[in-house]
Swiss-Prot record:
Source superkingdom: Viruses
Residue intervals annotated with topology Periplasmic: 1-6, 55-62
Main location: host cell
Lineage, uppermost ranks: Viruses, Duplodnaviria, Heunggongvirae, Uroviricota, Caudoviricetes
Family matches, as InterPro entries: Phage_P2_Holin (IPR007633)
Gene Ontology MF terms: pore-forming activity
Protein topology in the membrane: Multi-pass membrane protein
Role this protein plays: Accumulates harmlessly in the cytoplasmic membrane until it reaches a critical concentration that triggers the formation of micron-scale pores (holes) causing host cell membrane disruption and endolysin escape into the periplasmic space. Determines the precise timing of host cell lysis. Participates with the endolysin and spanin proteins in the sequential events which lead to the programmed host cell lysis releasing the mature viral particles from the host cell.
Protein name: Holin
Keyword NAD: no
A single GO BP: viral release via pore formation in host cell membrane
Domain notes: The C-terminus acts as a cytoplasmic regulatory region.
Pfam family membership, one: Phage_holin_3_2
Encoding gene (name): Y
């Protein structure tokens, strides 16, 4: 496995672990669909941090992982809220 592949996998796992922690700490009931969906969304949103390497190719892995953590925490919630609003808007029509 190359260093780039390890970086992408690290970012994905960071996002997944952040979401697992948030789901387990939250008060809402956990369903398998919700759990798996949020894990995938958090993982893929964290992987977006790899785009930073295009602008800053010499950025260290801990810095990229920090950006991935930030996106994993805030990014998936923004996307989830946008999706919920979109589907609620369709239901009212």
């Amino acid at each position: 496995m190359t260093a780039e592949e390890k970086s992408v996998l690290s970012l994905f796992m960071i996002g997944v672990l952040i979401v697992v922690g948030k789901v387990l700490a939250g008060g809402e009931p956990i369903t398998p669909r919700l759990f798996i969906g949020r894990m995938l969304l958090g993982g893929f949103v964290s992987m977006v941090a790899g785009v930073v390497l295009v602008q800053f190719p010499d950025l260290s892995l801990p810095a990229v992982c920090g950006i991935g953590s930030m996106l994993g925490i805030a990014g998936y919630q923004v996307i989830e809220i946008a999706i919920q609003r979109r589907f609620k808007g369709r239901g009212k029509q």
